[in-house]
Amino acid sequence: MNYTYDPAEVQYIVRIHNTNIDGTKRIPFALTKIRGIGIRIATAICKRLGIDLRKRAGEMGEDEMKRISDAILDPASVGIPESYMNHQRDIIDGTTSHLIGTRLDADLRMMIERGKKNKRIRAYRLDVGLKVRGQRTKSNGRRGRSMGVSRKK
């Protein structure tokens, strides 16, 4: 069964959670443009809400956008398992939540600062932009820095 859409009826840019989403892409793939939402949780949210995965993001109605927006803010309310969420067992209150956008960035910065206060090597390496998980750094992972070759004068 082939699902086709009419380009004349598509809203080309959809705004959800302060992010512009491409309206021509299918809903789960379009939702991955929101920072903190991956394909796994986007697909799970669409399936739990009963939204057709073949539908384009620009074809969504206002009620569908509202339901998706609410589900992104609180995935547990629609039955998404805790293992899908990106902030499990919070250090302060022990809750599990799903962070998106600037809340995710702020939480990452707080984690790095807390680690630097405790003198953790991982936090220092994250802060400087080096590899964290034991990879070698002599030849790979040189993005962002120019090694350059000095010219003979």
Swiss-Prot record:
Q: Name one GO cellular component term.
A: cytosol
Q: Which domain of life is it from?
A: Eukaryota
Q: Does the entry feature the keyword Metal-binding, yes or no?
A: no
Classification via Pfam families: Ribosomal_S13
The answer, when asked if Cytoplasm is one of the entry's keywords, is yes
GO BP annotations of the record are:
translation
According to the UniProt entry, its GO molecular function terms are:
rRNA binding; structural constituent of ribosome
| InterPro entries cross-referenced by the UniProt entry | Rbsml_uS13_C (IPR027437), Ribosomal_uS13 (IPR001892), Ribosomal_uS13-like_H2TH (IPR010979)
Location comes to:
Cytoplasm
Where do the segments described as Disordered lie? 134-153
Regions crossing the membrane: none
Tell me the PANTHER family matching this sequence: 30S RIBOSOMAL PROTEIN S13/40S RIBOSOMAL PROTEIN S18, SMALL RIBOSOMAL SUBUNIT PROTEIN US13
Give the protein family. Belongs to the universal ribosomal protein uS13 family.
Instruction: Describe the function of this protein.
Output: Located at the top of the head of the 40S subunit, it contacts several helices of the 18S rRNA.
What is the name attached to this protein's record?
Answer: Small ribosomal subunit protein uS13
Q: Which organism is it from?
A: Encephalitozoon cuniculi (strain GB-M1) (Microsporidian parasite)
